[in-house]
Amino acid sequence: MKSGIYLGKNSIEIRETDIPTVGDNDVLIKNIYSSICGTDVAVYNHGPNTGHKIDVDGEFGHETVSKVVRIGKNVKDFFVGERVYPYPRFVKKDTRRAGTIGGFS
């Protein structure tokens, strides 16, 4: 899959990356549309030390309209083909994983 990789101030590169493995409690989504927000612009223009959790060499971007393409065997709230708008800082019932969705680093 293609991913926008943040390389530092004023530098992003599109790279081919592996499709993530789907665990029993995971949902894999495919981006249909993405947007650029104020956080993206601030980090791009001013570098990673802007108070936002964006890592150099990490996947960049977090506002998407997506489609569910695979679900883990324990997932009951989503179905393959469903369109979703993922909120990158929330993972139902498991806040340790918040921020991992969509590569929001």
Where are these regions (language model features)?
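Glycine-rich beta-strand-centered segment in the early N-terminal region that forms part
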Residues: P20-S34, P48-T95, G99-T100
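Extreme N-terminal starter segment of soluble prokaryotic enzymes
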Residues: M1-K2
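Short N-terminal binding/cap micro-motifs at the start of the first secondary-structure element
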Residues: S11-R15, G38-T39
